[in-house]
């Protein structure tokens, strides 16, 4: 069980840098 929780945390950290790149295109979506 604890091993699965650690793996889920690693996936969340990888999603954070991808979201920062989406923020650049998010400005166009707000307009």
Curated annotation (Swiss-Prot):
GO cellular component terms attached to this protein's record: nucleosome; nucleus
GO biological process, one term: chromosome condensation
A molecular function GO annotation: DNA binding
Subcellular location: Nucleus; Chromosome
Keyword terms of this UniProt record: Chromosome, Developmental protein, Differentiation, DNA condensation, DNA-binding, Nucleosome core, Nucleus, Spermatogenesis
Tissue: Testis.
Record carries keyword Secreted: no
Sequence segments annotated as region (Disordered): 1-31
Role this protein plays: Protamines substitute for histones in the chromatin of sperm during the haploid phase of spermatogenesis. They compact sperm DNA into a highly condensed, stable and inactive complex.
Protein name: Protamine PTP4
Organism whose genome encodes this protein: Oncorhynchus mykiss
């Amino acid at each position: 069980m604890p091993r699965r929780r650690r793996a889920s945390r690693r996936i969340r950290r990888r999603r954070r840098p991808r979201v920062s790149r989406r923020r650049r295109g998010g400005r166009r979506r707000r307009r």
